[in-house]
Amino acid sequence: MAETEHRPTNFIRQIIDKDLSNGLHDAIKTRFPPEPNGFLHIGHAKSICLNFGIAEDYTGSCNLRFDDTNPAKEDITFVNSIKEDVTWLGFTWDGEARYSSNYFDQLHAYAVELIEKGLAYVDFSAQDVMREMRGTLKEPGQNSPYRDTDVETNLKEFAKMTAGDYKEGECSLRAKIDMTSPFMCMRDPVIYRVKHAHHHQTGDKWCVYPMYDFTHCISDAIEGITHSLCTLEFQDNRRLYDWVIENISIDCTPRQYEFSRLNLEYTVLSKRRLIQLVEENHVSGWDDPRMPTIAGLRRRGYTPGSIVEFCKRIGVTKMDNMVEMSMLEACIRDDLNANAPRAMAVLDPIKLVIENYEEGKTETLVAPNHPNDESMGTRNIGFSREVYIEAEDFRESANKKFKRLVLEKEVRLRNAYVVKANRVEKDEEGNVTTVYCTYDPDTLGKDPADGRKVKGVIHWVDAATAQAAEFRLYDRLFNVPNPAAEENFTDAINPESLEVKQGWAEAGLIGHVPEVGAWQFERTGYFCVDKDSTDAKPVFNRTVGLRDTWAKIGE
């Protein structure tokens, strides 16, 4: 393992360092084991970055293993989306993707071994009866009447379960541990259940499937995982993890360690709530840009680097806390500020007519793609007698603090000329639709010759060459920091989380998407092209604003 001065540290890395110094492992091996029954979200990204990051930093390896032990809820669609997300984040798993179902024969053999040792039994108790017999945190459980069934009978009954002789829920295989244990997971947990369902990997071969707690530890051992990293809700289950490994004939003895899961403000991360958002049409789908899924973040314009950086910043601890959404937004803002080329777009347009500019004349102006990075080069932008500006950038009258265009006042058009507003044209409702101006032809790239000061600068697009576009302004999905704490979390949905505007974009953007996947539309925010775009009508998603507007709201 190569030490680096800048490598982050945390309690898990300290454990690994100690294990290596004590000679416990020749190489570090981790795994990321999602269940293929949904789409990954930002919380999974934390685990991905931790497991793959450790493997990378310690010159080890990380497996991608699908915990596919519940065929009724799993699908190959989720398998493919998870692979795509992990790859998109920039990580490579060791060898082929693995599946818990690869080990079904071995898992079944280990279950038989436990029966033979008198450490597992087939229970025909109804599920509600079994639940009642488990007891509570304050009261010990009661032994099942099937707990002392002899080994030979249990082997026969488990064979019948495996052969499909029993219906779902009719019986299950339980580990024989301790019904008086203070830890509920140790009170004879179910390790196999009957399930007559087609499996996306094994087809119809099996009608009994192992439970997660039985599968997890054995799969780790089979793969030679050295450090099995889980979130804190599995802390008590570590006792069951160790019990299984200690009571079967397997050489490898992996160890489980727990860290706090990600809790992020202004969103929800529980699968149940995310499913509800989709099924009740509060969002357009799993990749809705307001969703915390990796697919949603990607569609919104988040870069892999920004998500990895976010996971680095939040760190790894055992403390359960709420992370500010502004931290995630700061990561993408920093990334795009440095790497996104600039362009201009007008989202709420009014026309500006330059009356002393020759009709039919066009110019090609040169604009920098990034004010602080000359290596990004320049671009050509058209300029003619009519341009579009933002409606909010013009007022008929204003105080001195307003540094944009006002009647009888001057302003500079970004990368172009100084113009002066002379008169306006309005619609029947009194809204300004057109501003008539004059321009100073000697101010291209320089200040007025007579020394007058023009302080304001506004963006614009050339009316002759601009492309009509749709702009989707996404914001936080909820208007309270912790929507999960609400009695009905959907009541906290932000009604202004999506605003759609029809405007104009600088020519030439579609077909020339930058490497980072986004632009900074000057003075407006960072935008990416949405999948709904067409050549005739591009659609741009706002990834994030130029600054944190929610910070002001909270003050």
From Swiss-Prot:
GO terms for cellular component: cytosol. It catalyses: tRNA(Gln) + L-glutamine + ATP = L-glutaminyl-tRNA(Gln) + AMP + diphosphate. Disulfide bonds: none annotated. It is found in: Cytoplasm. Pfam families: tRNA-synt_1c, tRNA-synt_1c_C, tRNA-synt_1c_C2. GO terms for biological process: glutaminyl-tRNA aminoacylation; glutamyl-tRNA aminoacylation. A motif ('KMSKS' region) lies at residues 268-272. A motif ('HIGH' region) lies at residues 34-44. NCBIfam families: glnS, PRK14703.1. HAMAP family: Gln_tRNA_synth. Monomer. This is Glutamine--tRNA ligase. It comes from Alteromonas mediterranea (strain DSM 17117 / CIP 110805 / LMG 28347 / Deep ecotype). The gene is glnS.
